């Protein structure tokens, strides 16, 4: 259910703001989005996996808070990230 290290490293390289960047808001949101998409696929097959549903809700809430922070602090980066990830905002 979790994303692989290789996929996570690809996402980090794509959204990093500088070399060695693993913790910027953009990277965190991108990794959470990939995790959320993986969990959605899992839950389509396993509808009654309530523990995973709870984890999905927690990840969505975390992403929502990070996006609100990014929107407050750096609006152009927020808009660029939303467009790159294909989120509906």
Swiss-Prot record:
Pfam families: Ribosomal_S15 (PF00312). The keyword Ribonucleoprotein applies. GO terms for cellular component: cytosolic small ribosomal subunit. Keywords: Ribonucleoprotein, Ribosomal protein, RNA-binding, rRNA-binding. The keyword Oxidoreductase does not apply. GO terms for biological process: translation. It comes from the Bacteria. One of its GO terms (molecular function) is rRNA binding. Part of the 30S ribosomal subunit. Forms a bridge to the 50S subunit in the 70S ribosome, contacting the 23S rRNA. Belongs to the universal ribosomal protein uS15 family. One of the primary rRNA binding proteins, it binds directly to 16S rRNA where it helps nucleate assembly of the platform of the 30S subunit by binding and bridging several RNA helices of the 16S rRNA. Forms an intersubunit bridge (bridge B4) with the 23S rRNA of the 50S subunit in the ribosome. This is Small ribosomal subunit protein uS15. The lineage of its organism: Bacteria, Bacillati, Bacillota, Bacilli, Lactobacillales.
């Amino acid at each position: 259910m979790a994303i692989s290290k290789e996929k996570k490293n690809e996402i980090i390289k794509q959204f990093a703001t500088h070399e060695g960047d693993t913790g910027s808001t953009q990277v965190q949101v991108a990794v959470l989005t990939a995790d959320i998409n993986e969990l959605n696929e899992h839950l389509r097959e396993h509808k009654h996996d309530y523990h995973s549903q709870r984890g999905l809700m927690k990840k969505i809430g975390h992403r929502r808070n990070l996006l609100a922070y990014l929107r407050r602090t750096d609006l152009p980066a927020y808009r660029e990230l939303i467009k790159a990830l294909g989120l509906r905002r």
